[in-house]
Amino acid sequence: MGTICVTGTASGIGAATKAKLVAQGHRVIGVDLRDADVCGDLSKPADRQRIVDEVNALCGGVLDGLVPCAGVSTPVPNELIVRVNFYGTLAIVNGLRPALEKG
């Protein structure tokens, strides 16, 4: 089985995805604001880069999959939705692309 990074693992779809992947025998690197292997705020550019760096360190630069489940929705401000759901996801996908290419 492979090593897979899942964002949003503290609750909801991210938590369920992590549980399913672990049950299938995968190693999961969870990312969330808290209660995760890598904790950080995807709305903040500095945290995005740190998350990428920490995931890369944990996976040894080789990642077999990425499931970006982290996200927010109303009633939070639209600006926060865009920062997390768009820019946060884009930064994680782009930042982990080299590790995914090796997996």
Segments from the language model and where they lie:
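Conserved hydrophobic beta-strands of the Rossmann-like cofactor-binding core
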Residues: 3-6, 66-67
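N-terminal Rossmann NAD(P)H-binding glycine-rich loop of SDR-like oxidoreductase domains
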Residues: 10-19
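Conserved NAD(P)H cofactor-binding loop of Rossmann-fold oxidoreductase domains
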Residues: 67-75
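Cofactor-binding loops of NAD(P)H-dependent oxidoreductases
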Residues: 40-43, 70, 84
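Conserved Rossmann-fold cofactor-binding substructure of NAD(P)-dependent oxidoreductases
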Residues: 43-60
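Active-site loop of short-chain dehydrogenase/reductase
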Residues: 2, 61-63, 100-103
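Rossmann-fold cofactor-recognition segment
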Residues: 31-47
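Amphipathic alpha-helical dimer-interface segment in Rossmann-like NAD(P)H-dependent oxidoreductases
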Residues: 79, 84-103
